[in-house]
């Protein structure tokens, strides 16, 4: 009795909930690497002012060594992803990390493909 009721309930739920909701979820980002990079960019933006102030204390040679060491400890206490060195430019279409044209935020491969097919306005092949 209970199993048949559970089975009929499952059939009803499958009809009500669309199949896309139970399948793979799509997001704005191409893959997890791009999402990770976006999170790092947000973190670097949040801690940019604090990091700049602490680094200026660390690199100031006029201040006493004790104060510089305290600043070193404070920088070490900040999250790793707040450091702008960990940010990587990625292609917005493929998330490829290398060969990215910064102006268009596209990898060289995607850039050439789109330029060859006339999908980038103002871009044309060199003719001489």
Curated annotation (Swiss-Prot):
GO cellular component: mitochondrial inner membrane; mitochondrial small ribosomal subunit
GO molecular function: structural constituent of ribosome
Classification via InterPro entries: Ribosomal_uS14
Record bears the keyword Glycoprotein: no
Entry keyword set: Mitochondrion, Ribonucleoprotein, Ribosomal protein
Pfam families cross-referenced by the UniProt entry: Ribosomal_S14
The UniProt record lists the keyword Aminoacyl-tRNA synthetase: no
UniProt subcellular location: Mitochondrion
GO terms for biological process, alphabetical: mitochondrial translation; translation
Subunit structure: Component of the mitochondrial ribosome small subunit (28S) which comprises a 12S rRNA and about 30 distinct proteins. Interacts with LIAT1.
Record family assignment: Belongs to the universal ribosomal protein uS14 family.
NCBIfam families: PRK08881.1
Name of the protein: Small ribosomal subunit protein uS14m
């Amino acid at each position: 009795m209970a199993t048949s009721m559970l089975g009929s309930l499952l059939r009803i739920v499958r009809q009500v909930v669309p199949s896309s909701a139970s399948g793979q979820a799509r997001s704005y980002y191409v893959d997890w690497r791009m999402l990770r990079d976006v999170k790092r960019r947000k973190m670097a933006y949040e801690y940019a002012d604090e990091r700049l102030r602490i680094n200026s204390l660390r690199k100031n040679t006029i201040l006493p060594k004790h104060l510089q060491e305290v600043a070193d400890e404070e920088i070490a206490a900040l999250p790793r992803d707040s450091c702008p060195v960990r940010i990587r430019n990625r292609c917005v279409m493929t998330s490829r990390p290398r060969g990215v044209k910064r102006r268009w935020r596209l990898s060289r491969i995607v850039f050439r493909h789109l330029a060859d097919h006339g999908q980038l306005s103002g871009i044309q092949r060199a003719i001489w």
